[in-house]
């Protein structure tokens, strides 16, 4: 089960917002988006694109794969990944089996990632392939030695190291299979979100429920909801709540999500010219480099130009 300790998590948020929660769960929001989107393109990651129907199939396969690995409702699935189709698909898969996602920032040092994992003791960890090089603290054998509860170590890329499996291997093995039924309630644990750690050596970890985080995401963007029915570029990390909120907002409107794996002005402008986004989600520091880039090229689409 999710390890909840008073010094780590806020478990009783104030009830003085004046707005009731919407009773949402991520599996239901995703199912509604799939129904609306059908065979339209839902997710773009570089040259890799998924329609809503294909994304549903991939989510189901990885959900079943997690279950067959031993992940059960309430377990934690840690994602230490850049923006990618693997990240969002595994987040959806984990939610559909009642598991709790913990995003871990790419900028964290391996020792800091390891410290977070040892605190939370996840049932599954998903990492980039480069973390398995050189016998570091995030290799499959090293993690399994200190995390006896660990049932799966997944890596991106084409080659699995010792004690790991690639995301693609799990996807292919369980393709066409549905996950075993699990009750996911609006008040079920959904996300463990660590703070940046800039105020102490021990990051705080906040526990969010499905309805709490999703209601907030819908409320935050409801004034501009129609724009999210178009094409959205997420140019900030999905390991931050701001990045995740952009993904949820697109799901509410069955919008097309385009991912930028890391900030680079040239790659962003190229992507914006190609995709013609109606919404770009980025942090202010990125936008300070975006404006000069647009001025130099004079070729960014109007929809992607800052005012």
Curated annotation (Swiss-Prot):
Protein keywords: Antibiotic biosynthesis, Ligase
Pathway: Antibiotic biosynthesis; candicidin biosynthesis
Keyword NAD: no
GO terms of biological process kind: antibiotic biosynthetic process
One Gene Ontology molecular-function label: CoA-ligase activity
Gene3D superfamilies linked to this entry: N-terminal domain of ligase-like
Keyword Ligase: yes
UniProt family annotation: Belongs to the ATP-dependent AMP-binding enzyme family.
Role played: May be a p-aminobenzoic acid-CoA ligase that activates PabA to start the biosynthesis of candicidin.
Protein's name in the database: Protein Y
Lineage of the species this protein comes from: Bacteria, Bacillati, Actinomycetota, Actinomycetes, Kitasatosporales
């Amino acid at each position: 089960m999710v390890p909840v300790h008073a010094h780590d998590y806020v478990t009783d948020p104030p009830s003085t917002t004046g707005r009731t929660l919407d009773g949402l769960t991520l599996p239901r929001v995703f199912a509604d988006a799939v129904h609306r989107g059908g065979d339209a393109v839902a997710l773009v990651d570089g040259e890799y694109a998924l329609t809503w129907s294909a994304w549903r199939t991939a989510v189901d396969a990885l959900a079943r794969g997690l279950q067959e690995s031993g992940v059960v409702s309430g377990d934690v699935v840690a994602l230490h990944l850049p923006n990618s189709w693997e990240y969002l698909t595994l987040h959806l898969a984990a939610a559909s089996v009642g598991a709790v996602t913990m995003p871990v920032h790419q900028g964290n040092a391996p020792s800091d990632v390891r410290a977070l994992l040892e605190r939370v003791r996840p049932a599954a960890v998903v990492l980039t392939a480069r973390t398995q090089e050189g016998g570091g603290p995030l290799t499959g054998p090293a993690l399994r030695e200190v995390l006896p509860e660990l049932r799966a170590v997944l890596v991106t890329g084409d080659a699995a190291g010792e004690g790991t499996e690639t995301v693609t291997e799990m996807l292919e093995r369980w393709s066409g299979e549905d996950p075993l039924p699990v009750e996911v309630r609006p008040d079920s644990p959904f996300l463990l979100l660590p703070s940046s750690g800039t105020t102490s050596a021990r990051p705080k970890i906040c526990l969010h429920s499905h309805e709490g985080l999703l209601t907030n995401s819908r409320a935050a963007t409801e004034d501009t909801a129609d724009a999210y029915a178009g094409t959205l570029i997420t140019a900030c990390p999905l390991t931050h709540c701001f990045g995740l909120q952009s993904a949820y907002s697109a799901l509410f409107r069955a919008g097309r999500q385009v991912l930028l794996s890391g900030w680079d002005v040239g790659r962003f402008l190229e992507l914006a010219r190609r995709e013609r986004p109606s919404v770009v989600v980025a942090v202010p520091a990125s936008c300070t480099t975006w404006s000069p880039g647009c001025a130099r090229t004079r070729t960014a689409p109007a929809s992607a130009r800052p005012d």
